[in-house]
A protein has these predicted regions:
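Short S/T/G/P-rich N-terminal loop/turn motif that feeds into the first structured element of a domain
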Residues: 1-68, 74-90
Length: 90
């Protein structure tokens, strides 16, 4: 499993951001995303964590998905990191 963390700037309307993320989720799944979580990190910022089936899926699709998501929901990427999942605990 591979994970990406993306920092987004948005208009501060959390409910709208959630609905937009839900609407865009099917496109992310088509690109190989397995799970996505979002955390409000400030009045106008959200950080997403997305799990992917493979690093190859991320490398093939991440820039395209970030651009399309940003355009579709009016958010802009302010930062990001990625890496292989080292441990998963339930």
């Amino acid at each position: 499993m591979f994970a990406t963390f993306t920092d987004w700037e948005f208009d501060g309307n959390v409910e709208n951001a959630i609905e937009n993320a839900k609407g865009f989720w099917p496109e992310m799944k088509k690109a190989g995303a397995v799970n996505m979580r979002a955390t409000v990190t400030g009045p106008n910022s959200i950080r997403t964590m997305t799990l992917w089936s493979s690093q190859e899926d991320v490398e093939a699709n991440l820039d395209k998905i970030r651009a399309a998501a940003g355009s579709a929901v009016g958010m802009s990427v302010t930062g990001g990191m990625m890496g292989t999942i080292a441990v998963e605990l339930d």
